[in-house]
């Protein structure tokens, strides 16, 4: 959860939008529930000026903070597992699959793709 939120800059992860599957007989945690509520991510509130360039979007991304912990990258790095790192390595070549009719502008998509790749790279740095 922390790694994904760091990659997509999900500013709205809070204690009401993640959970766990619980064994009803033992009342023990079985597994984390699937993640949901990623609506405040991928620079959805960024303005036209923020999408003016790769640098501008990077500066904007660095102003975003998670809702209930201190920072995206540091918190995610503290809990990364080998499995997380494997997934992050796959994001180093990330590209959105374009829909035939519904897309942001090619410029916006390219800038967001670069941010996803860069944020994955930052998480993998030692």
Question: What name fits each language-model region?
Answer:
Residues 1-10, 15, 19-126:
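Anionic ligand-binding catalytic core segments
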């Amino acid at each position: 959860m922390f790694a994904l939120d760091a990659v997509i800059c999900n500013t709205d992860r809070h204690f009401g939008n993640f959970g766990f599957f619980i064994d009803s007989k033992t009342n023990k945690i079985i597994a984390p529930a699937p993640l949901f509520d990623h609506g405040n991510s991928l620079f959805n509130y960024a303005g036209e000026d923020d999408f003016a360039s790769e640098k501008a979007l990077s500066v904007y991304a660095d102003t975003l903070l998670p809702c209930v912990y201190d920072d995206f990258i540091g918190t995610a790095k503290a809990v990364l597992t080998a499995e997380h790192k494997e997934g992050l390595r796959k994001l180093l070549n990330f590209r959105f699959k374009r829909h035939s009719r519904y897309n942001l502008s090619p410029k916006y998509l390219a800038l967001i793709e670069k941010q996803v790749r860069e944020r994955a790279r930052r998480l993998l740095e030692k």
